[in-house]
Amino acid sequence: MNGASRGDVQRPTPVQAPAKRPIPPTVFRFEKASKIGTSLDTTPKELPIRRPVPLPGPRFVKDVNPSPPATSSPNVQTQCHQPPVVRSQTHQASVSQTTPTQTTPSQYTPASVSTARAPQFHRSSHVTPSQQQRIEQAFGPAPVSQSQPQNGSYIQYNEPSTSVASTTTSFYSPNESEPVFTHAISFKPNEPENGQKAREQLELLDSGKINEINQSKVPTTIELPPNCKLFQYSWVLDGIPRTLLVPMPMDATEEDVKAMLPKTLEMDSNLFNNARPRDELPVLSFPNGTVPNVEMIGPKVQQPMLVNPKQFNRIMRRREMRQQLEASGRLPLARQKYLHESRHLHALKRKRGLDGRFDNTKTAESSSMVSSTTSPRKLKRRNRLPGEETSDSSSIVLPSPVEIQPKGGIVNSSMPSTSTGYINNGMDHQTDYIEHQQPMSTYDQYHDHVQYIAPDGNVNYHNNHDNGVDLTGSDGQSFTNL
């Protein structure tokens, strides 16, 4: 099935690429890479190569209020990580004497700091006691280290190294006797606290303004009698919103409030603000911890309904479609009051409960009362049977032939009839039936021959012995089965 019946498939011959000629060795040129060139090629352009500079060990303390920066600033290598450490004057002199002797080349290259961006300050020759106290409060007392440097490029201290600037005498200019710093931290005097600032600002204000500010911060307290409610009236006078709270009895109305207010106020129902939250009301004090009812007068302000953009676009789309249908006449301009008027009328007639819902129990009770008041019409029956005592055979009242069922038994008087319409309207037009009926003295005579006049005027006879099953009782009564 998979192509085996067709035979072997002829495979194409693979195409072989022509052999390529080897590349002659004269094309390549080998050059010996120098060490300097390799370092230059591998070094990024953003990091220029710096020659190692000896890092001596003296550390200097800057002035709190430094002098103006120097005009000429040499290229200084610095490294700052922590605030400067205070040193005594004698210790600085001893360190400065040993600095020139340590000029051995170092293997450590510190980071270069540009002197164009950083401020440059001179070292102060003297530190005042107040400045020393401020420095100790800010950074704590600095321990003095007695360790000597082991190498010219590495200086070891027991405490953390926080050198602000590191220079050598070779970088000094001829006319300068003090080193130049590229980094400095200024100590500002302690600023007054927030409370002190507030007091200074309040001292500048007038005493009358201070009283107004204090009075505005005191909450308003209103004492109300029990069993009362508040009416809130808001209006704007000269651009200033004003609010009036009127306490009234529990049964008071809007008309009573209008009568209480002065006539100068323009009473408008729209001025009664019913949308103001209770949080904005002044603080109220009620007797016995009770809270009166607050009744807002006027129509409720309809708040806008917030929808998302998708719902908004859909709403606008439906409005456009409705306008198009109304313009074309396919949609009536006035909507129908009820979709089915008959259902509405039926709903009005139904009984409802206290909550407005339909009450099915009341409907069932009303229907049962109607059925009990209209009792069905009972069937007429014979007074006596032939075997029973009878006073006068001529007084037997025979029922109408429609009510007599020759094939059935005795009808129970307590059983309601289900064919009232047939009884009332079945043989009403036969008014001459009783006149043509002949009296019978015995039941057998009546049972053998039942005679009645049909609507067409013919006399019909029915023989009851041939139909049904004989149900003769012990007393000789004969009945027929239904």
From Swiss-Prot:
It comes from the Eukaryota. Disruption phenotype: RNAi-mediated knockdown results in ectopic expression of the homeobox protein egl-5 in the head region of hermaphrodites. RNAi-mediated knockdown results in morphological defects in the male tail due to cell transformation defects whereby anterior seam cells adopt a posterior seam cell fate, which is indicated by ectopic expression of the ray-specific protein pkd-2 in the anterior mid-body region. This leads to impaired cell identities of the rays derived from seam cells. These animals also have defective cell transformations in the ventral cord and generate two extra serotonergic CP neurons. Residues 1-160, 344-414 are annotated as: Disordered. InterPro entries: NFYA. A motif (Subunit association domain (SAD)) lies at residues 306-329. GO terms for cellular component: CCAAT-binding factor complex; nucleus. GO terms for molecular function: DNA binding; DNA-binding transcription factor activity, RNA polymerase II-specific; DNA-binding transcription repressor activity. Keywords: DNA-binding, Nucleus, Repressor, Transcription, Transcription regulation. Residues 72-93, 126-135, 144-160 have a biased composition (Polar residues). It is found in: Nucleus. One of its GO terms (biological process) is positive regulation of nematode male tail tip morphogenesis. Residues 336-361 bind DNA. Its main location: nucleus. Residues 94-110, 363-375 have a biased composition (Low complexity). Belongs to the NFYA/HAP2 subunit family. Component of the sequence-specific heterotrimeric transcription factor (nfya-1-NF-Y) which specifically recognizes a 5'-CCAAT-3' box motif found in the promoters of its target genes to regulate their expression and control cellular identity in particular tissue types. In association with the components in the nfya-1-NF-Y complex, represses the expression of the T-box transcription factor tbx-2 throughout larval development, which most likely restricts its expression to certain tissues. May act to repress txb-2 expression in conjunction with tbx-2 itself, which has an autoregulatory role. Forms a heterotrimeric transcription factor complex (nfya-1-NF-Y complex) composed of nfya-1, nfyb-1 and nfyc-1, which binds to 5'-CCAAT-3' box motif in the promoters of its target genes. Interacts with the nfyb-1 and nfyc-1 dimer; the interaction is required for subsequent binding to the 5'-CCAAT-3' box motif in DNA. Does not interact with either nfyb-1 or nfyc-1 in their monomeric form. Interacts with mes-3. This is Nuclear transcription factor Y subunit nfya-1. The lineage of its organism: Eukaryota, Metazoa, Ecdysozoa, Nematoda, Chromadorea.
